[in-house]
Amino acid sequence: MGNNVVGAYIGVGSNIEPESNIVDALTRLSKHVDITGISSFYKTAPLLRENQNDYLNGVWQISTSISPDELKNGVLRRIEKELHRNRESDKYAPRTIDLDILLYGDMVMQEDDLTIPDPDICKRSFIAFPLLELKPDLVMPDSKAPLVNLLGALSKENMIPDKIFTESLRSMVNK
């Protein structure tokens, strides 16, 4: 793994055969990084689309020495491509898998194709609550504010926990 090992968090989502695609993505990712935590996974309605299947969303905690750019473009995007993710024009289109770096240690960065922390953390319940589950005392590296204080109007109301699927994922890494 190298010397500079960093804790990071990956947002995970799928609404095309989510159970098999998320398991497949976890297996592939575990060949590149150490998976150190798996949040509860939730069934959630698709954003801004009514004629799509529900999503399964959650967060993976990892430990890695891979740089953020290499993690995104060399590992996560490659896994998405291998699982036939189509990253075309409609950012709300159905997807086989969506893997996003949410946090990478205490890093704050803004580049053309990568912003850390991910700006959606405080906007999307299906990212914020699983992240808090893994790290309840999380302080956001950019604002220095505790995440729990930034949730505002976010609610778990429309998030349905999938306990059986969550346990099956956790059993994959807790061997």
What is each model feature region?
Residues 47-54, 69-73, 78-175:
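Flexible, gly/pro- and Lys/Arg-enriched active-site loops
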